[in-house]
Amino acid sequence: VFIAAAFFPHLFTHYGQKEMFKAWLPSTAEHLLGTNSLGYDIYTELIYGTQETLLVGITSSAAALALGAVIGALSTLKGFAGAVFNGLINVFVLLPKLITLIVLASFAGGSVKDLIILIAAFSWVGAARSIRSKVIHLNAQPFIENCVIQGYSKAHIILRHILPNLYDVLMARFLLSINSCIMMESTLSFLGFGDLYHPTWGTMINFAYKRGAFIRGAYNYLLSPGVCIVLLSLAFYLISLYFEQRMKLISGR
């Protein structure tokens, strides 16, 4: 439903994104969640905010996964190089992620691109640790040792035997990362570091709080984006559990 709303918002609302009405209208058949202080339909704003929220979540998660996969794989190397990348993972594990993000976001431009870069830069550690653990496990398997004994090149072993066995862990980490990336974006946007020209659900909560929605009793304006954030995060989490279970079944064979 959320993905459909992101790609086909006109199927869910017949109002335009910037179509204005009387401010602070209550919930009615014409305006399901009422209108905000500027007269925008809150339900329509929620539908169009789905696209921006998913854009940040999926893009930053994909970037974090790519970075984490590379660093995680390189950390399994023997010698100095492997120790450096493993040390890098350990350093980022100890960093207070949210506080660091807030400090850096205060110096960034506040655009969607800046948010994606910042969130991705601090979301790769989980993927790196999972990939590192999986690669070490695979390297200890008899079929990998047989490939080495038979003289297959490292490229052949990686492409034909390592990468195919990483699919489930990559998908699980990707979906879990979307969950955390959406939460981080929502937190930063609520604190005022989001892009005002591309409002997400977090930005909606920020606007609602600043414009006195609570005082006016416009609880729909405050609660609806928060409920959507929770439901979307829960959906990605449940899908990630499926891939984690598959990974455990395959590892147990």
Predicted regions and their residues:
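Transmembrane alpha-helices
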Residues: 51-67, 155-187
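Periplasmic/extracellular loop-to-transmembrane helix junction in inner-membrane transport proteins
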Residues: 17-60, 207-224
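Generic hydrophobic transmembrane alpha-helix motif, especially the helices
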Residues: 32, 36, 76-77, 81-137, ...
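Glycine-rich helix-loop "coupling/hinge" segments at transmembrane-helix boundaries
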Residues: 106-108, 135, 184-224, 228
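N-terminal signal-anchor/first transmembrane alpha helix
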Residues: 1-17, 88, 166
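C-terminal transmembrane helix and the adjacent membrane-cytosol boundary/short C-terminal tail
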Residues: 121-122, 175, 217-253
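Transmembrane-helix boundary motif in ABC transporter permease subunits
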Residues: 9-10, 56-90, 102
